[in-house]
A protein has these predicted regions:
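Hydrophobic/aromatic-enriched cytosolic interaction surfaces used to assemble or bind macromolecules
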Residues: 1-220
Length: 220
């Protein structure tokens, strides 16, 4: 609603928005003050020193139609470039949406956390997106295919090891679909500080287990 409180949740698993869904889904028939589309797709973190010209999309092995969808996010602290492209851009005829890439939002949230060193992980049923902040700067942005709790835990711990992050000190913030894949119980034996940040203005009347699904959306 107008104060940002979540008043309705509906989860629909699909590969594309069909004409039938557009006609039959009640939530898509309403008028909204604002709407947000969060997409996914290939992305890369590019050190500024490697960039010769402004054609950042050449760093992504994409077809031309996907390159045209690419969005560039420049880290204001280092001028390093995070470039992301949408795999698809669904449109809903009667709803005008602001479009964001999920990694863009995750990186922005991590950089705005005001924590010197931290890791952020977003879980989906098919992948885990990992952002690492070191000295308030974006050190890592990567995505890995996962299918179970152990996969997610493996990639998180591998990032700690490869980047020499002290597991007793560097906190892990984990959000996303923890109902489907949840490595937190396993990771508590290895990482001292694990947080599951809650969405802003979360409605106490809604089931709390759904909250991590919407942390990114409510940080916009």
């Amino acid at each position: 609603n107008n104060d940002g409180t979540c008043i309705a949740i509906k989860r629909i698993n699909l590969e594309h928005i069909s004409p039938q869904l557009l006609k039959e889904e009640p939530l898509l028939q309403l008028n909204y003050h604002s709407a947000t589309y969060i997409g996914y797709g290939p992305f890369a973190l590019i050190p500024k020193t490697l960039v010769i010209d402004e054609n950042y999309t050449t760093f992504l092995p994409l077809e031309n139609n996907l390159r045209q969808r690419a969005k560039t996010i420049v880290n204001p602290l280092t001028n390093d470039i995070l470039i992301a492209a949408y795999s698809n851009q669904w449109t809903i005829p009667n709803i005008k949406c602001r479009k964001y890439h999920e990694v863009e939002l995750l990186a922005t949230m991590a950089l705005n956390s005001h924590t010197t060193n931290t890791m952020w992980a977003e879980i989906t049923p098919q992948r885990i997106n990992i952002i690492v902040i070191h000295d308030h700067k974006l050190q890592l942005a990567n995505s890995y295919h996962i299918s179970c709790d152990n996969d997610a835990a493996y990639y998180i711990l591998a990032c700690y090891q490869q980047l020499n992050l002290p597991q007793e000190e560097v906190e892990l913030n984990i959000i996303g679909d923890l109902l489907t894949i949840n490595p937190v119980p396993f990771l508590t034996d290895y990482i001292r500080h694990i947080n599951t940040p809650q969405p802003q203005n979360w409605n106490a009347e809604l089931p709390n287990q759904y909250a991590p699904l919407f942390t990114l959306q409510t940080k916009l």
